[in-house]
Amino acid sequence: MAKAATIKIKLLSTADTGFFYVTKKNSRTMTDKMSKRKYDPIVKKHVEFKETKIK
């Protein structure tokens, strides 16, 4: 059986609110850490979210 190409990751807010999104990425094409600007409802702003592992 083949290994799955997509893995689940957690995007954690850099505003230190503890808010996170769970998304998936293709681990074969995106080998570096993912970061996106998304909305953090706790601070009510768009902030940078960085990839961390799901524990």
Swiss-Prot record:
GO terms for molecular function: structural constituent of ribosome. One of its GO terms (biological process) is translation. It comes from the Bacteria. One of its GO terms (cellular component) is cytosolic large ribosomal subunit. Keywords: Ribonucleoprotein, Ribosomal protein. It holds the Pfam family Ribosomal_L33. Gene3D superfamilies: Ribosomal protein L33. Disulfide bonds: none annotated. PANTHER family: 54S RIBOSOMAL PROTEIN L39, MITOCHONDRIAL, LARGE RIBOSOMAL SUBUNIT PROTEIN BL33M. HAMAP family: Ribosomal_bL33. Belongs to the bacterial ribosomal protein bL33 family. This is Large ribosomal subunit protein bL33. It comes from Bartonella bacilliformis (strain ATCC 35685 / KC583 / Herrer 020/F12,63). The gene is rpmG.
